[in-house]
Regions:
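Long, contiguous binding/interaction regions
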Residues: 1-197, 201
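Catalytic-core regions of core metabolic enzymes
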Residues: 174-895
Length: 895
């Protein structure tokens, strides 16, 4: 019970440890006295000596009072708990009159080596920064290798001095690139191992195992046994002595020996008691297939919260509830723990489905296409383990070469983008995102998130597998040049049209290659597409592939092959064999006899499923061209250098934060002077602007700003309407300005108007930053102008933004030639525009309370940029789950 009004609940966190288990971190409480005594009693003599520099068999009452009674400011302590037992403590005491905190920690011997020390230190450092601590100091014994190791690997710049037999340590606790990198590397390893414990268990209990065919507990047990799971399986059913030919147990706690994974298929009302029993048993992980949670209203959600809390209290991670199960085809595991139909062969594709209903479709489609899977997870309610966790696992899994995702939402879009980008640098991530038609969910935002992270987006389940089979079976294309050949001129023409429509190049072959084709195949249609004629056989197909490979003029070959007239089965098989003999570095795909997947004739040997070098087939040339275009887009993204987030000069975040104090955070647009002052320390200089209540104030402002001037309406709907007289430009004197003031007022109505000095000419652009609920912070750019506002969509990217991202963003908008130098015009200062984009992006990182920032227009001039107007709204910044120390997300994520 917490009776301390100053208790900092924001410091409570569930964390994944280095071995894949979890622990609860929280501030110490006054009611922890007995837990602390028990914790101390379980420490070895060596651990006690290393902590106190003396052997202290028990803690005295004054010790207990001093350790548990803290002020959460100058004296802070965090504990790690497992099943209500304290297993680790970390604390700091502020040194008098300083911003230094003297730090000490101790971890129970049984839990040392699990990564608990670094996790405690991360969270204590975050708490210390919140309380004004800037540096930690500590004294330790040279023999305390565990403590020295924690400090050494934490990523902080640790200064060490040996004095009087002790090691004096000190280090600043402000996050650095090094410390953040180390923290995220630990996070990756921990989350990957936590998923591995679920997908590679040594033993499994099926709780709710049933004798009734069709019941989830029956199908789970049958699937496990029929697939030959490599470890022991324990049915748990209090009403049966035997299930499926195996001894059944009435309670998981009665199972002899350890249980790594529990599959739970009992009514929703019983799940909490089962999870509690699993915690006592020491089960590592849970897969809950039971429904009646997130889909059952407030009562179901409350049930879900309880189940997740129980699992985390006992250090268990869980998949589900409402999951369809998991599959791991590794021959050393052979875990088929699902009641969905379909048993795919072993392969190289990892599949994540956020929808239980689609799980069966995934497995059936993979089997139909002969696409082998490495693993499969149906996540259900996503109460704990999420797509981000699976990405961490697949990033490290050597058996997985391609990742497929079906997503309905993002629990933590910023973290998803970061991890997906890391995975995408080594293996493709293909995603089908549903739900974009729902209110409040921006499809453009999701597209920006995927584009920034290198995620290959598809629009249907069929496209998901069509793209996946190309990635899984063929090398990435080296460019966008496509050679098309086959025995049907009509299909070849359709393929060429589809390639052109998707931005692929179908180049004409050079004369040398055409001569060779005529000599070797007898065809006269040699330009590209290459039509071998309806009677072409394996020899002609093989020769044409050789010529295309030798030409150096194509990066991929799309073969369109229809059954030859009166073709014998052996001829069809030989045609497939000829396609497989293409040069190994060339990407080859086919529309082969109208089939999709990998027909037997196109399959290369593999371990269960067709192996690398198999030729994927598509039902139509359009489907093949689409898959190829996605592969080429991904290959280009992967080959593009990532760039770096540059350190900007004249970018004073502290000064900007000072100017935030007292500003409205209710989402309304702030007054222009406040916004201008806020942006100035960040190097974003808004064009000088004065607000004039009447014509005489306008004249006085013009005298101060300098002639000529522009006169503009304040209201956004009028601000750019030069066409209706709401904006007047190039006013050169007082009389002209007075007359213009009256004219503009007659259009827009009463109220003040803006007066600005005329800006040098430039290309009008619009820069916008907005916080999107589905994808996080988004930065967009487009050309400006009234007509462009109606006709051109902006190009949008998620953050962080590197220097190369900024350069690519400028060159990706429609009409970018106006910036880079259209015929007859000089180029604008695109480097200044890129600098502005980087500043806005880093502003979003530094000031998460900025809900929206609009710079419209920004004139990109020959030298520099001129933001003529700015709008900015603030919000109360919520906690960013991807900033600060690592922690598990909330127990229930709305999909």
């Amino acid at each position: 019970m917490i009776d301390d009004p100053d208790y900092p609940r924001q410091w409570e966190a569930d964390v994944v440890l280095g071995d894949g288990g979890t622990a609860r971190l929280r501030p110490i409480r006054s009611d922890d006295a007995d837990r602390l005594r028990s914790f101390h009693s379980r420490l070895s003599k060596e651990t006690v000596y290393n902590r106190f520099f003396a052997f202290r068999p028990v803690l005295s009452d004054p010790d207990i009072a001093r350790f548990t009674q803290v002020d959460h400011v100058d004296r802070v302590a965090l504990v790690a708990t497992l099943r209500d037992d304290i297993i680790g403590v970390v604390r700091y005491d502020r040194l008098p009159g300083s911003s230094d905190g003297e730090v000490a920690f101790v971890v129970e011997d049984a839990h040392q080596g699990r990564g608990l020390g670094p996790a405690l230190l991360e969270h204590l450092a975050a708490a210390g920064r919140e309380r004004g601590i800037t540096r930690f100091v500590a004294d330790t014994l040279p023999t305390n290798r565990a403590m020295l190791g924690v400090f050494r690997t934490a990523g902080f710049q640790v200064h060490r001095v040996l004095a009087d037999g002790y090691v004096e340590l000190s280090f600043p606790i402000r996050p650095t690139d090094s410390s953040v990198s180390v923290m995220r590397d630990r996070e990756h390893r921990a989350e990957a191992r936590s998923v591995k414990r679920l997908l590679a268990p040594r033993s499994v209990a099926v709780i709710g195992a049933s004798r009734e065919p069709g019941a989830p507990g029956h199908e789970l047990l049958h699937s496990l046994l029929s697939s030959g799971f490599c470890g022991p399986v324990f049915p748990v059913n209090p009403a049966a002595a035997e299930v499926g030919g195996l001894t059944a147990y009435s309670d998981v706690r009665e199972v002899p020996g350890p249980v790594d994974l529990a599959l739970i298929a009992v009514p929703a009302a019983e799940v909490a008691d089962v999870v509690r029993a699993c915690g006592v048993k020491g089960v590592h992980g849970l897969v809950i297939v039971s429904g009646g949670f997130a889909d059952a209203g407030p009562e179901g959600r409350a049930r879900l919260e309880e189940v997740v809390a129980l699992a985390r209290e006992s250090g268990m991670r869980l998949i589900g509830p409402n999951a369809m199960g998991v599959v791991n085809t590794d021959p050393a595991v052979r875990l088929f723990a699902t009641f969905a139909a379909g048993a795919p062969a072993a392969g190289r594709v990892g599949v994540f489905s956020q929808s239980g209903a689609l799980a069966g479709s995934f497995l059936a489609e993979a089997s139909r296409r002969s696409l082998g899977l490495s693993s499969f997870v149906s996540i259900g309610d996503r109460a704990d383990v999420s797509g981000n966790d699976l990405l961490q696992y697949w990033r490290a899994d050597e058996r997985t070469e391609v990742v497929l995702l079906h997503l309905q939402g993002f629990g933590n879009p910023r973290k998803f983008a970061r991890i997906a980008r890391e995975v995408g640098r080594v293996k493709p991530v293909v995603a089908l995102k549903s739900g974009h038609g729902q209110p409040g969910r921006s499809d453009a935002a999701v597209g920006a998130l995927f584009a920034s992270a290198g995620v290959v987006r598809v629009g249907s389940l069929a496209q998901l597998f069509e793209v996946a089979q190309l990635f899984a079976l063929q090398p990435l294309p080296a460019g966008r040049r496509v050679g098309i050949l086959g025995n049907s001129s009509a299909l070849a023409a359709m393929a060429a049209d589809a390639c052109h429509d998707l931005g692929l190049d179908v180049p004409p072959l050079d004369e040398t290659s055409q001569v060779r084709l005529r000599e070797l195949t007898g065809t006269t249609q040699t330009v590209n597409p290459v039509d071998l004629g309806p009677f072409a056989g394996p020899a002609e197909l093989r020769s044409a592939l050789t010529v295309l490979g030798d030409s150096g003029q194509v990066d991929a070959v799309l073969a369109v092959v229809v059954p030859p007239p009166r073709g014998r089965p052996e001829v069809v098989a030989e045609l497939g064999a000829a396609l497989r003999e293409a040069p190994p570095a060339m990407t080859v795909l086919a529309t082969f006899l109208g089939g999709d997947g990998v027909p037997a004739g196109l399959a290369a040997p593999g371990d269960g499923a067709p192996g690398r070098g198999s030729i994927p087939s598509y039902a139509s040339p359009e489907a093949a061209a689409l898959a190829l275009s996605r592969a080429m887009d991904y290959a280009e993204w992967r080959a593009r250098p990532e760039g770096e987030v540059p350190e900007l000069r004249r970018f004073d975040v502290d000064a900007a934060k000072d100017r935030l104090v007292g500003l409205d955070t209710d989402g309304r647009w702030l007054p222009l002077p406040e916004v201008t002052a806020l942006l100035q320390p960040l190097g974003i200089d808004i064009w000088p602007t004065s607000l004039a209540a009447d014509a005489e104030q306008a004249v006085a402002a013009a005298q101060a700003l300098g002639w000529p001037v522009a006169l503009k309406a304040v209201a956004e709907q009028w601000r750019h309407r030069l066409d209706v007289g709401a904006v007047r430009l190039g006013l050169t004197g007082p009389d002209e300005l007075r007359a213009a003031f009256g004219d503009v007022r007659s259009v827009v109505g009463p109220g003040p108007l803006y007066v600005q000095p005329m800006a040098p000419p430039g290309v009008s652009t619009v820069v916008r930053l907005v916080q999107d609920s589905s994808a996080g912070a988004l930065l967009s750019l487009r050309l400006g102008g009234v007509a462009v506002d109606l006709l051109v969509d902006p190009v949008t990217r998620t953050l962080p933004l590197t220097d190369r991202d900024a350069r690519a963003l400028v060159r990706s908008i429609r009409g970018h030639q106006l910036l880079t130098g259209a015929p007859g015009s000089a180029p604008a200062d695109v480097e200044a525009l890129e600098d502005l984009l980087l500043r806005v992006a880093q502003l979003a990182e530094a000031l998460p309370g900025v809900a929206e920032l609009v710079l419209d227009p920004v004139l990109v001039q020959r030298n520099g940029v001129a933001p003529l107007h700015v709008g900015l709204r603030l919000r109360e910044p919520g906690a960013d789950p991807d900033r600060g120390p690592r922690r598990l997300g909330s127990s229930y994520a709305v999909l």
